[in-house]
Amino acid sequence: MTADELVFFVNGKKVVEKNADPETTLLVYLRRKLGLCGTKLGCGEGGCGACTVMISKYDRLQNKIVHFSVNACLAPICSLHHVAVTTVEGIGNTQKLHPVQERIARSHGSQCGFCTPGIVMSMYTLLRNQPEPTVEEIENAFQGNLCRCTGYRPILQGFRTFAKDGGCCGGSGNNPNCCMNQTKDQTVSLSPSLFNPEDFKPLDPTQEPIFPPELLRLKDTPQKKLRFEGERVTWIQASTMEELLDLKAQHPDAKLVVGNTEIGIEMKFKNMLFPLIVCPAWIPELNSVVHGPEGISFGASCPLSLVESVLAEEIAKLPEQKTEVFRGVMEQLRWFAGKQVKSVASIGGNIITASPISDLNPVFMASGAKLTLVSRGTRRTVRMDHTFFPGYRKTLLRPEEILLSIEIPYSKEGEFFSAFKQASRREDDIAKVTSGMRVLFKPGTIEVQELSLCFGGMADRTISALKTTPKQLSKSWNEELLQSVCAGLAEELQLAPDAPGGMVEFRRTLTLSFFFKFYLTVLQKLGRADLEDMCGKLDPTFASATLLFQKDPPANVQLFQEVPKDQSEEDMVGRPLPHLAANMQASGEAVYCDDIPRYENELSLRLVTSTRAHAKITSIDTSEAKKVPGFVCFLTAEDVPNSNATGLFNDETVFAKDEVTCVGHIIGAVVADTPEHAQRAARGVKITYEDLPAIITIQDAINNNSFYGSEIKIEKGDLKKGFSEADNVVSGELYIGGQEHFYLETNCTIAVPKGEAGEMELFVSTQNTMKTQSFVAKMLGVPDNRIVVRVKRMGGGFGGKETRSTVVSTALALAAHKTGRPVRCMLDRDEDMLITGGRHPFLAKYKVGFMKTGTVVALEVAHFSNGGNTEDLSRSIMERALFHMDNAYKIPNIRGTGRICKTNLPSNTAFRGFGGPQGMLIAEYWMSEVAITCGLPAEEVRRKNMYKEGDLTHFNQKLEGFTLPRCWDECIASSQYLARKREVEKFNRENCWKKRGLCIIPTKFGISFTLPFLNQGGALVHVYTDGSVLLTHGGTEMGQGLHTKMVQVASRALKIPTSKIHISETSTNTVPNTSPTAASASADLNGQGVYEACQTILKRLEPFKKKKPTGPWEAWVMDAYTSAVSLSATGFYKTPNLGYSFETNSGNPFHYFSYGVACSEVEIDCLTGDHKNLRTDIVMDVGSSLNPAIDIGQVEGAFVQGLGLFTMEELHYSPEGSLHTRGPSTYKIPAFGSIPIEFRVSLLRDCPNKRAIYASKAVGEPPLFLASSIFFAIKDAIRAARAQHGDNAKQLFQLDSPATPEKIRNACVDQFTTLCVTGVPENCKSWSVRI
């Protein structure tokens, strides 16, 4: 049977594909076939939004053109027949930016830029549907988009200028409702704006591209069945119900796909293959919406976005009593997923997928929704009850049946309904527990006639509490019923200690908490229905427990110092210059590694990794791999021409030989003609193992004495004397979990052999060109000078590409050497997370001695980190943790020790802060316990113990230019700390089940590589005869704005406009022997190198300037050229006077320190563990800022990354050492809605730093730790909750990091948690272990 042609439009151009493969996604087609690389691959599972595009089609049922956003990484091209696709390239370019592109660029909303095109397209789609959106609609548009760099504030602030309801004016003062005016401090004068909205192009909806007329002409043409055949899969697009039922009768195993949001993931990540896929999306009956007498019936193919809009309309016009169920469904849909998923995911698919943690199925089950099932010749209606899901991922449907529709019922008089969900993150997250709850009372009474309590996340399917609910019938809605239900649920809803998903006590407690919320909500509604006399009055302190999550309108302030009035307009230092690549990033023109056009004879590589934590390799079978079309070769350690040993300490291998030491250890690599064939072949490689004992956790390592190197120690004073003189001594321990970098662009390399003298060129996404070069050269057995490494830009790095990127690059270089052809590999997100390691988990055991006044006199901390299977940078990271164990406090008698645990996990590595945040969190943890034990305000104890100017640290470095007290006092004042503390106490008295916390935290962060010789930077400056300047330096651009700052430095040094200066890339053949772009020091080191090179040029131009004092610049340059004077210069800088000895505790490890203070307020839900970040005020000393926009962006971005570290991001490993959390669906980084509602950042004024270029300071890492103010505010709120339930206010309790909903809920001990205590049998292995 012949296949049909696929016809669709992309950016107005017609595309006819004669060989459409159902396995090809729109993303792959756009990038590889059409060369449209603006759309990015961030995760491949619809979780990050980097691949967002807009789809436009004529909707025959609504009789209109509709526009909606989709994830191109999940959309099969076969689903796009007769639609129009718009990508970021289709709406504007750098010659003429669309207003959406312009505003994100000019409001500084693009740092690394990898997420930017997807965010642009989400906003563009909103504006196509709603040219004048509200602020809330704008925020909701980004629920399916993630950004790891910016902290989201500048994106939202830029796009709020489109809003009709008080769009931000950016501080221009033209808006009477301006957020800055509303919250303006009296203590500091307002800065100029970071951007001026008046400069923005207005949005003109009439100028948008039209829907293709050819597609519009087809609207009345009957749709016909289509067939597309790929290499392994056939896709049939059914156009009528009859065709569909016939197909299902003939092929009962055929998969029905509408949005591909589930099947696509199963095929990609679970290696499932469905040879026949049938798409029923066109069938009218499956898309119909029917308003019946008992409810609204939705066809099974109706997208969830349509369900949402229909129910919203009904809720607006129907009586409240009739829409109880509708509002429950809407509450679940609110947090269900991003717009991209809801636009295509069908209501029927959501039901039939039968997920045990479905958001919607418990709601449908509790509501008694009716399902209509049809097959050829039969039709039946069933109620969705406990029998509908007979087992894991199973339904009552017969193989030949399909779901035709679902009827969501109207609620009756006396019926109440609520829906609940708790996840790690509110937006776009998989639930831990979901629930639908319904009660129907006998008319005019509070006696229960029907009660339905349904749950997801409590079994292998959606369940109903069938033992508990019948016992409540005919009971009155009162305290007695509450106790009965809670006892019943605790008994009925048991979970095994090793239940998949873990968090057993938390999940069990949530079922009771949800019912308690439902009980209170119903009680409240009964009171409004004049039944208060029967049921009793709701305690007013309980009322807030019934409130659904509401977010106040955001308010943001950014304060910075203006440049001097006499500064030349051409001198851009100190001005908020946008990132130089922002326009290219916003238009999709910025080129990342995988965007480089493919070579004609290019091959693709996929890694083959270990599935065991520690084992001998007994055999490798490649026979199945070789059968895959396009297979070229399989590489192992035997193929390495020179040295298989690699890594910073030669303790790693290019490929594992004989033995593997972690899950994810690279054993070999498959090379094939396409990425898809390479991946299939890699999965076909079968490896057998002989398991060896594995060490997974820090505790395992301690028990087995498994460490790297000797103990590291810093000691000062007389510890014994200090403890003996102390009034109080407190001991304890703190565990700090690891963190995944989650740069949006995964590791990527293209290796191109040059065919002579062993030369090779590598295009790499790396922070470390030098080590990439030397590791490849060593592996191949050639001198470094034969290997050129080039980096244009990275889509984020954060330390994750400092050393670990080399494991990919080295394998690629071997493949290119072996085949003699260019080879490319961009890791999939799950591979990247599995292989590359992350932030080190820490365990600290501390003992602190202090006086009754709160003065700390003695401290001892033993630090243990989980280093993983190789040493990598673990020792330097532990050293920095010890250097920062004091944070900002003078402790006369102190000892800090550090051990790095050698475990069978992927090697952990550098991550923004480099051990500093772990050391400082421990310091603030015991400091908070000192304050509690003394009964003193924490802020007083912190201030009392703080260093002063000229003090020596515990490692004997003198503090000079110590601005921290200024930052502290300014933050106390600008945050109105003392007044707000009283307000928090008042709120906590008035609310039993919601509590607020407030905390202020300082940071002191040392700037320099602690390995002295790394503190060097270089630059190369070429001046061309037209006066243009090409600048190269040793640092790489990963979104932090380094290139922009270097151009600003060169501009001031040469006294020419920034427009004359260009940076193309970083490469080993321009600036050699570079230090990694890390340690926050790159602007300092390379900036000074740039300055030196520019000075050399200026000296050479001096004679020509004297001859022509008025210039212009171009004349001096031409005169120098014609006089045969070199117009090329290098510059070099090394940081002076560095070097510390652990043996003698002397010398300076740091050139200077950066300081900052943050005050944060949170509100926790004691029943669910949920929290919201109400407000954060930050005062940061960045010296004389080179670029306030970039520096504020770094402060906000680092803070939000720290927010993830301390409250949200949690890695789950199995007891066998296998990572569970391998993508955005299971690993949650902060989203748009996670940031503080009020976010106020102030750069300290008048604090020039004499030790760095143009008096600036480092900013990349220091602000991250300030997010611990959120952690400690949460702990403050938990303490208030525990005090309410009988805990002594001075009683200490352990709260490990991150403070996830699970930890918050479990710490808020109450009558519900005590019912759900779950013992763990001795030999039971839990689902995940604390590594």
Swiss-Prot record:
Disulfide bonds join C535-C992. Its EC number is 1.17.1.4, 1.17.3.2. Substrate binds at E802, R880, F914, T1010. Induction: By interferon. One of its GO terms (molecular function) is hypoxanthine dehydrogenase activity. Residues 228-413 form the FAD-binding PCMH-type domain. Changing C1316S: Abolishes conversion from the dehydrogenase form to the oxidase form. One of its GO terms (biological process) is GMP catabolic process. It catalyses: xanthine + NAD(+) + H2O = urate + NADH + H(+); hypoxanthine + NAD(+) + H2O = xanthine + NADH + H(+); xanthine + O2 + H2O = urate + H2O2. Can be converted from the dehydrogenase form (D) to the oxidase form (O) irreversibly by proteolysis or reversibly through the oxidation of sulfhydryl groups. FAD binds at residues 256-263, 336, 346-350, 359, 403, 421. [2Fe-2S] cluster 1 binds at C43, C48, C51, C73. One of its GO terms (cellular component) is peroxisome. Key enzyme in purine degradation. Catalyzes the oxidation of hypoxanthine to xanthine. Catalyzes the oxidation of xanthine to uric acid. Contributes to the generation of reactive oxygen species. Homodimer. Interacts with BTN1A1. Belongs to the xanthine dehydrogenase family. This is Xanthine dehydrogenase/oxidase. It comes from Rattus norvegicus.
